[in-house]
Amino acid sequence: MANHAKLVDQEIYRSPVDDFELNYQEYLNDDDDDKQEAPVAVSKAPKGKGSNHGLGCRMKGLFDGFGGTDLKTIMRHLRRRRPKSGQALTNFMLSGNMEKVVDQHVKDFVHHFGRINPENGRIMGALRGNDFFNFGGLHNNLGNTGKVYLDNLMKGKCGKKRKVHKFKPIVVEELDFGAPKPAVPATPKAPVAPVAPVIPAPAVTPQKPKVDEPTYADSVSDFGLDFETEREKCLRNKTLFEDPEFPATAASLYYRTPPRDRIIWKRPGEIIANPQLITQGESRFDVKQGALGDCWFLAALANITLYDALFYRIVPPNQSFTENYAGIFHFQFWHYGKWVDVVVDDRLPTVNNQLYYLHSADNTEFWSALVEKAYAKLHGGYENLDGGTTAEALEDFTGGLTEYFDLRKSEKAAVLAALVKGMEMGSLFGCSIDADANIKEAQLRNGLVCGHAYSITAIHSITYYGEDTTLLRLRNPWGNEKEWNGAWSDGSSEWSKIDEATKKQIDVQFARDGEFWMSFEDFFSNFTQMEVCNLTAEIFDEIAEMTGVNRATETVEEEHQWHEIMEDGEWSSKKGTAGGCNNNPSTYPKNPQFSTFFTAPQSSIEADGNVTVIVAVLQKYRRELRSKGKDVLPIGVSIYSLGAEGTARSPLTAQFFSQNRPIARTTVFVNTREVTVRFRVPPGQYVIVPCTFDAYDDAEFLLRVYANGTLKSSLL
């Protein structure tokens, strides 16, 4: 059984966004925010005028626009927003919704194809690379969204909204918490004829690599690999690409625990006669878990397949096993604040001629296995993907910002509001059930699996015995029969009371495929954590550039959109910036301090004069450092108000911190890649202080601030 995120064992899901641990009703009934002492030592001070923070604030902020804070009000809103067709509420970017808009654009000749064949998606004038290598292969079955994006890409119309950098693997041995040092430049070896390297069956005791054994980064160009250049070189020489940065060797598979089976690296054309990158369009059923404990990654990837425009940002459509095939592919990920293009060859780990890790339900399709390989390269090896959170992968796939919800501490109506509002705004959702530290991914009697990552793909209000019932559709990335078996599960008695037309409208399918429906009540009672990935206006702008579809013109009403700023920073004991939390009052002021000022349009200011803000701190390179025995640190963040007239041009002092409480903060320091704080305050100037729990812990981090307004920031 696959091992779920080790980070779960370390209480990664203890919500870092809960400022003071109040439930929502306590917040409504009592203005005293000091119900429970935070683990951070701070002096008590009066609550800032006009400011809201804590769990109560977060819950209250979610109800904006619903007209009420009770469950029935939220359900009425869901019924009003239900599409006229009767389909479940998802969001306009979901594959079916986006495809309908693009289909109409193609039908109305809004988009004029110039560089690809609109019938089959073939690139005009492309070389059939498979003719060289006798690997077979068929054309990709791109939908119209993929075809329009590919045509725009070939015309040079895409890429203005998002700068993508060539990926340069870091040398972990030289990582010194400053800017990561690139590998020593070297000339990559010329590609040679394809082979299938064999890794002998490992010994019982893992073998450590020799001290003088070169790492995969030793042969990396200082500038990284360029996909077009490398592919053209291979086509010209009639050779298949072999990645010098991520070779088909044991070093790419593991650093500590070798696979149990004898691994043979094979190209798709050596596994099956007619491989395809994508068959019949990408689908959430294309993602099935293999021998690696990366269900967190699979859950996010399955979620992304629901959004054509987001999917093709990760999997550029200008590659296939037919046109210009040369054994080389590339994929794009958000990586610590910037987008990178990761180039890989198509040699994949196999056992008995079957893919060993992630694979598609269709054995002729290979996009998901290749994405996993590129993601493994991004983080230094396949074993580095063992254990994580869906939130982490969702951010790397979208560039969005993810929040955690501890469902045990959240109001039911607020969680439903988050689901409805999030679906309307294009947010992505994941969820899980806390697992016992000694039992990995145990299946409960109701069919759900503890410590396992699920994705939430739809929400729908249905009439059952005259009463409104809210249903959620969930997806288990294992893609098998391990599904919910309670009310509204596949083939349950509840569905017999629903007419066939309604079931067809909301796409109800009874199959052992890992997808199932359940009531919101059962979801709230059984799941303990939920993750929401928020997307910015810039992401939607790029999607409009890719597809010609403007979100604002397709939604029922203009929704508020997030705007973002990012700042790089580091906690360095060498530079005197690793001050630790406020339990260390003498060193705490040494932490990096960021002055943030934001203004907001009138439409973003809510009735009480406040604006919703999300602050996130993400620590870098910790997954890559696992091979050196280092993992994520417990981190937190505090936000301080300078008042209506206050300004800051230099770092705040120990005296300031002793006399002022933060207006928002993380009270639980969590050993996770990223922590977030959501709060509501008037527009103005605030100082953000990210920190580790212990002083003198070294790490680099990325600070992000989301708000419905104009943002400015600087390091004090």
UniProtKB/Swiss-Prot annotation:
The record, for InterPro entries, names: C2_III, Calpain_cysteine_protease, Calpain_domain_III, Calpain_III, Calpain_III_sf, Papain-like_cys_pep_sf, Pept_cys_AS, Peptidase_C2_calpain_cat
CDD domains, alphabetically? Calpain_III, CysPc
Give the region (Disordered) as residue ranges: 31-53
Q: Does the keyword Ribonucleoprotein apply?
A: no
SUPFAM superfamilies for this protein: Calpain large subunit, middle domain (domain III), Cysteine proteinases
Q: Where is the signal peptide?
A: none
List the disulfide bonds in this chain.
Answer: none
Function per UniProt: Calcium-regulated non-lysosomal thiol-protease which catalyzes limited proteolysis of substrates. Promotes starvation-induced muscle atrophy.
Entry protein name: Calpain clp-4
What is the native source organism of this protein?
Caenorhabditis elegans
Corresponding gene? clp-4
